[in-house]
Amino acid sequence: MSGVCTLVSQKKKPFIGDKKFFEHYGFKVVDTINDYELMALSFETSETPKFSDSARKMEIDSQDFTIYYSNECPYVEYEVKELSDYAKDKGIKLDFIKIDSLDKAKNAPCVFNNWANFYKGKFVSNTILNANAFEKLLK
């Protein structure tokens, strides 16, 4: 496909684009996973983009709290260090998986590759966590 894609949600969620804004500029929903929609603005007739099979799972095998992240946001490395230190101090098992290649992004277990929280194998949120927010999610 020659064009542009974006991720939106059927319900307003943090860090997700506004669907009505993109519809106004001609974007169309081309795929859906749960509440998340892939919108595309095609510049030519070609193959329609879609979410990868791995993203459709929205779950992982690990039962530990696991965060998939990339450096798309300038605060990510700071939060990774803060959470890592916090988990170590509290004796909490916390895994980080950095998405640092195109292959890893294409094979991520959910629609987010900038920050995705999984707990007990299930996708929890895409909110970048600090120590306080992390502690609340564990309760």
Residue spans for each PLM region:
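Thiol-based oxidoreductase modules, predominantly thioredoxin-like and allied folds used
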Residues: 91-104
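Conserved catalytic-core motifs of GNAT/GCN5-like acyltransferases
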Residues: 8, 19, 23-40, 124
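Structural micro-motif
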Residues: 109-118
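Non-catalytic, surface beta->alpha helical segment in thiol-disulfide oxidoreductase systems
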Residues: 119-139
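Local sequence-structure signature of Cys/Sec-based thiol-disulfide redox active-site neighborhoods
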Residues: 54-89
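C-terminal "cap" of GNAT-fold acetyltransferases
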Residues: 34-57
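Conserved GNAT acetyl-CoA-binding A-motif
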Residues: 1-15
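Structural alpha-beta junctions
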Residues: 1-4, 25-31, 87-94
